[in-house]
Every structure is written in structure tokens, then in C-alpha cells.
Amino acid sequence: MIIRSPEPEVKILVDRDPIKTSFEEWAKPGHFSRTIAKGPDTTTWIWNLHADAHDFDSHTSDLEEISRKVFSAHFGQLSIIFLWLSGMYFHGARFSNYEAWLSDPTHIGPSAQVVWPIVGQEILNGDVGGGFRGIQITSGFFQIWRASGITSELQLYCTAIGALVFAALMLFAGWFHYHKAAPKLAWFQDVESMLNHHLAGLLGLGSLSWAGHQVHVSLPINQFLNAGVDPKEIPLPHEFILNRDLLAQLYPSFAEGATPFFTLNWSKYSEFLTFRGGLDPVTGGLWLTDIAHHHLAIAILFLIAGHMYRTNWGIGHGLKDILEAHKGPFTGQGHKGLYEILTTSWHAQLSLNLAMLGSLTIVVAHHMYAMPPYPYLATDYATQLSLFTHHMWIGGFLIVGAAAHAAIFMVRDYDPTNRYNDLLDRVLRHRDAIISHLNWVCIFLGFHSFGLYIHNDTMSALGRPQDMFSDTAIQLQPVFAQWIQNTHALAPGVTAPGETASTSLTWGGGELVAVGGKVALLPIPLGTADFLVHHIHAFTIHVTVLILLKGVLFARSSRLIPDKANLGFRFPCDGPGRGGTCQVSAWDHVFLGLFWMYNAISVVIFHFSWKMQSDVWGSISDQGVVTHITGGNFAQSSITINGWLRDFLWAQASQVIQSYGSSLSAYGLFFLGAHFVWAFSLMFLFSGRGYWQELIESIVWAHNKLKVAPATQPRALSIVQGRAVGVTHYLLGGIATTWAFFLARIIAVG
């Protein structure tokens, strides 16, 4: 730690009224670009307008101005998020059966959307139980509302109105901090202050206030709900906050107030700050007292973390010093210069954040089922499947975005002249070794993982089950995964005193939690089938990484096109007379990476969906016999490609294909429509630009003949635009097809 003389205290960090508010200017399409503002000559204009509207780098090269635009846009984004949240809460208040669900969450499905009868769509209002007809929702909002202690639709109304107020506030802030008081570049680059505020403020105080809310509001209300008290009889949230005796009836240590805290007698609080592990047998969710304890602990960690960096007082860490000290014996200059990169290139910063957030989102997907945090979430199979799928897709997109912005950084912001022998330079200098090794790994994984399946299909086809890789013939047990499971199953009591169960029931240990005759969670057995599909996961992930990383490392130059940096982030080919140089731009790598990301995530969510239906989800009889939805067929069926097609895709598609005439029929229509959207994408991906330009010429000829030719000349999409439209519809069609397939199936059988 370096002690320096304190910086001068007062800095003027904003410019007043830098840019006037002008509706006239905003009304002109393309006002941000001299070329686009001239108006359209050809139909390409509308595409360029969309491509460049948010590409602030193309509007100006002034980093301060770009930073202000990004900052202002963030407020706009927050405003939209608040508006969306408000809509969710409003639907809960106005169109939902939340209060009925609260009284009987095991037999009543959550619904917050009622279809109006216009041409017979009221068939979609299925009976979700308790005499309510509507569309079953799978977003998990009901469970999170119960966990936070919301007991009435009035409370949902109030929250919805509050969110609207915040949306308006954010909209105002976005305008204010661009037009009235715009921060200077130095403010955006003051990373220590930013870290302190984000760590201590957002994460620290945010977690602390949530922990406080849980202890004072959620826990007592959930105590009453679990005991079967009618929600209308439960005291209102403010009564618990204002009247300590009310809480003391539930948690006697409340009578002592803050005394145990200041006398370090903290064990007094162990009634409502617990470390139990496992699930609450009443709700099938994590113990809310464990969750409150967790948020309190997280708050303390982040409050400390928020006081670590040097700002106006000459004490604490400086990020630049930390980075420059970060050298190993084989890494040359190490992280020297990284500080400058991350404070002058927002693409580099964004890339890092997207990679982290994408990975974190995928971690969330896995925790949501292994450690279901909200009451009655684990037994709502449709919601569980939706949450897993949603977080997997989002994580995949964010990680591809990380590669995209890393490549944009390389093309637009990387300055090779002042980068020598630091880590990035060294990685770029041995990129051939990295990419060729990664390519070898992909080939190895691809042939071996699919080879195991093809072997099984062949043996199965020839009627030789004894020669297949399976739990009953040649076993390939995932021994490392089983060892990890076993270690965690035996961990309680060692990790924390008083912990009664392991962090997740999925580890093992024979415990099963069922709520209302439905399995919430039980130990998940892993076998040969999982070993096989996990190697497919390894294969698809490595190929995605290969494509994306090649795009980043060869974004500026390659043996084929040494001057690639001059061509920009996206270009179709390296000009006329250079055949074989198409699809090499950094943008094209993102484009190709998206398809493999789609492959990778699809295999993951298929694996999850089938595995859970086969080995976890199901009903339990009074005698304690568990009947799984697909009767444990995963281990024997998923070890051949044919099994995946026959027993997963085909067998489980029957619900969506046969949904016509029922309340699930919308999923049948979506299944059909999304297939069409997907097929439509192929038209853009398989044909070249010339084909369409030729077609357009003859259509224009016909218009001229009839004297109805438009002033704006029609043009075929550029090669890059065509690919963009293609991949968009490919992903949209594929994801919506999967969505309809999953939901129709799980709502019907779950």
C-alpha cells in the first residue's frame, strides 16, 4: 500500500448545459451522421440508420462525448426496466390469482394473464385451479413475491406505481446528465471512486437493506403463511417494523434489541440468522433464515470491499499500482498498460463485464434448480424449466457479446505502438499456437464424444446391447463428478457448526424433499449417459470458444489479410480481385460464434429437461414411492443419438403437436410459426446478394412499366446485413420453437 499526499479536495466534475435540448434536431432521422442525415437515395439508408444509431464511436471520436452518451443511455435502459417491472407487478395486481395461489400454492397454478374473447382465444384461459381461468405463467414472480412478504394485490399495485415513478425519474436523469450537468471524462475514469460506490453502495448497502427487509418483513410474514394463517389476518409489513413486540412473539431475541450485537453475543440472533443448509420441508425452498444470514454476510464483505480503494484520502489501493505489480516469471511486463486500456476503451471494459456477467448468469441458472431460493419454486416444474432455459440463453448471448466487444476493442481502440511485451501483446504473438491447439482439442472432443454415441447406435442397431457403453454393459462412470458430489454430501457439520444438511440436496445423502405429493428435490444420480452428454457439452463449448477467440486474436491482422485493421470491424471480403477472403472480419466470427453458442446451449437445456423429468421430477405416494415423469428412462435412452430423437424430441413433442383445441394451443401455433421463422432465416443464409439484386432489378422494371417506381432506389441487403438478418431469425425461430416445445410439454405433464 502506498501512502501519498492527499489529492486537492474539490474538483469540478461536471459541465453545465453542454448540449441544448432540441426536439427539432431529434425529429430528423440520422441527425447523428452527416451522410445519413441527407436522407435516403436507396433502401440501404434505413439499414445504415439502424446499424449506426447506437454506434456512438461512429458519431464522434471524442471519448468524453461518447462516455456521456453511454451514461445517459444507461438511464434510459433503467427506465425501460422499471417500466417492465411495473407492468409485471401491475399484472399481478390486476389480472392474477396471486391471493388464491398464496392460500394453496401446491394445487393452484400461478396465472397473471387473462385472454379477452375476440375470435375465440378465450380457449387459452386454462383452469389453473381454485376456479380461476387464465394462462399459466412460468416467470417465478409469484414465488419471489411470497418470499419478499407480499400478501395482497394492493401491495402489488403500490409497488407497480412506485416502479413507474422510478421509471420517470430515470428518464429525467438520463436527460439531466447529458443536457444539464454532464460529467467530465475524469469522472468516468475515476475507477477507485466508482469501485467504492458500487461495492459499498450498490452491493453492500443493497444487500444490507434486503437482509433488513427479510428479517423485519419477509421472515415473520412467511412464518405465518407456512403455519397456514390466512393472508388477510397477517399484520401488515409496517406493523412488524414499528412494533418490536410483534416480532418478539415470533423471535424472542428481538425483545433484546441491539444489545446482543454490541455485546458481541451474536448467537442470540441465531433464531432468524441460521446456517442450516438443505431445504425447508414446508415450501421446498431454501430456508429464508439462511438467505437473510447470507445477505447480511455478503453486505459486510462488500461494505469492507468498498473501503479498500484510494480516493481523496491518501490511503488504500490504487488500481493502476495493483495492475502494474501483477507480473509472473513468464509474463513479461504482465498487466502494465491494462489500466490505460480499461479507462480509455469502453469496449474493452464492456467485454470484460459481459464475460463475467455471462458466466455468472449461467451459474445462476444452475443454482436456481440445485438450491431453489423461493418458496414453492422447486415444485413448479414449468417455472423451474423456464428459469433454467432463460438464464442459459442469456448467459450464452452475453458471452458472445464479450467476444464481439473484445474484437471491436482490438480493431478500434488497440494501439500496438505503445503495447510491448505485456500480457496482451504476448498472447497476440503466440496466437497461432493457441488457436491451432484449441482446434486440435475441438477435433479430438468432436470425434470422441460423437464416436461414443455412434458406437452405441451401431451396437444397438445390430442388436448387441452387451457391447454398448451404458450403466448395464460397458460402464463409463463420471468418477470425478461422483467424487465431488460425495464430498459435498458428507460436508455438513465440517463446513459450519450447526449445519444440518449439505448446500444442495442434489449432491446426495439420500434425503428427499417433497411438497404436496410432488418431488421438490432429491439426490441426482450421475452415470454413463451423463458422462457421454457432458463430453458433447465440452465439445460445443470449445468450438464456440475457438470461433470467438480466433475472431478476437485475428481481428487486426492475419497471414491472409495483414492489414485487416484498416478494413474495420465488419466487412464482407477483402475487396475485388482477392478471392477466398470472405467471412474473415471480426464481425463474421461473432456471426458464426452465435450458431455454435446456440448448439451448445440447446444441448444443455435438452440434457437438463430430460434428466430432471427422468430422475428428479415426479410424484410421491403415501408409501414413499417416487414415480418420475418419464420413469427414469434417461440412463438407457440418451446413450444413443436415436434415443435422443425418439425418446426425447419425438416422444415429448406429442404435447405441443396435439395441443390444438386445448388451452395449450397457443404453444402449438408458436411451435409451427417459430419453425417457419427459423426456415425463413435459411433464405438469407444460403443465397448470395447478387441473386436478390438480380430479382430486384426485374421487379423495378415492372414498377417502371406501370409508372409506380419509388423515388428511393431498392437495393438488396449487403452481404453483412443479409447475414445479420439470417442469424437473427435463426436464433429467434430456434429459441421460440424450443420455448413452445418445453412449455407445452411441462405444463401438460408437470
From Swiss-Prot:
SUPFAM superfamilies membership: Photosystem I subunits PsaA/PsaB
Protein's UniProt keywords contain Secreted: no
Note on cofactor: P700 is a chlorophyll a/chlorophyll a' dimer, A0 is one or more chlorophyll a, A1 is one or both phylloquinones and FX is a shared 4Fe-4S iron-sulfur center.
Enzyme Commission number, as recorded: 1.97.1.12
Entry function: PsaA and PsaB bind P700, the primary electron donor of photosystem I (PSI), as well as the electron acceptors A0, A1 and FX. PSI is a plastocyanin-ferredoxin oxidoreductase, converting photonic excitation into a charge separation, which transfers an electron from the donor P700 chlorophyll pair to the spectroscopically characterized acceptors A0, A1, FX, FA and FB in turn. Oxidized P700 is reduced on the lumenal side of the thylakoid membrane by plastocyanin.
Entry protein name: Photosystem I P700 chlorophyll a apoprotein A1
Membrane spanning residue stretches: 70-93, 156-179, 195-219, 291-309, 346-369, 385-411, 433-455, 531-549, 589-610, 664-686, 724-744
